[in-house]
Design a protein with these regions (language model features):
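Active-site helix-to-loop segments that bind/position phosphate- or nucleotide-bearing substrates
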Residues: 1-54, 58
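A generic "cationic amphipathic patch" detector
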Residues: 50, 86, 163-166
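Intrinsically disordered, low-complexity, compositionally biased regions/tails
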Residues: 13, 18-19, 98, 122, ...
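Generic structural hydrophobic/aromatic packing signal, biased to beta-strands
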Residues: 37-39, 108, 153
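Cysteine-cluster motifs in flexible loop/terminal segments that predominantly coordinate metals
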Residues: 133-166
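Short, hydrophobic/π-rich interface segment
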Residues: 92-145
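Internal, well-folded beta-alpha domain core
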Residues: 52-114
Length: 166
């Protein structure tokens, strides 16, 4: 998506607005463009008779797969945009992180053909359960260097103005 979609405290995609508080704190003039993504971990069924430990190991494996995927996508986007000059790919902005509300999930999914990669929004949940949706920003410089404390921010309607970490 175009850099004009990145505004003060929000992403604006056509008529849809998605609050993301950290956008109040970054230098938006550095942003070149962005990407919305969705993917899921391998969907492996565990028999009911399996031990609790086996189920735990499977969940840890799925979480590790998603972390690796997110990092691979970030690295790929940074390489892709750094052919002529150095560009940076931000960490993933997503619902529940960097001040983006969980309610952003169905909005982000609606912009993608997520079902082509097996991800869908149904009954107020992402399916499969181990799925992710989010945003990467490509920029001329490091965007989040001074916003490390924002990573776990769940967001609030008032934005960053009342944040004690600001």
């Amino acid at each position: 998506f175009d850099k004009s979609c990145v505004q003060d405290g929000k992403f604006q995609f056509g008529g849809q607005e998605i609050r993301c508080n950290v956008l109040e704190r970054i230098d938006r003039s550095q942003v070149e463009n962005g990407y919305i993504y969705a993917f899921h971990a391998p969907n492996i069924n565990v028999d009911e008779g399996e031990s609790l430990l086996a189920k735990y190991y499977l969940e840890v494996f799925q979480i590790a797969c998603m972390d690796v995927c997110r990092q691979q996508i970030q690295d790929y986007l940074e390489r892709k945009h750094s052919v002529l000059q150095k560009q940076y790919c931000s960490l993933s902005f997503g619902p529940g992180y960097y001040g983006m509300d969980i309610d952003a999930v169905p909005k982000l999914i609606s912009f993608l053909e997520a079902d082509t990669v097996g991800v869908k929004w149904q009954e107020d949940k992402l399916y499969p359960i181990m799925s992710l949706v989010g945003v990467y920003l490509i920029s001329k410089g490091e965007l989040l260097a001074e916003c490390k404390d924002c990573a776990g921010c769940l967001g609030q309607a008032g934005g960053c103005q009342y944040c004690m970490n600001r």
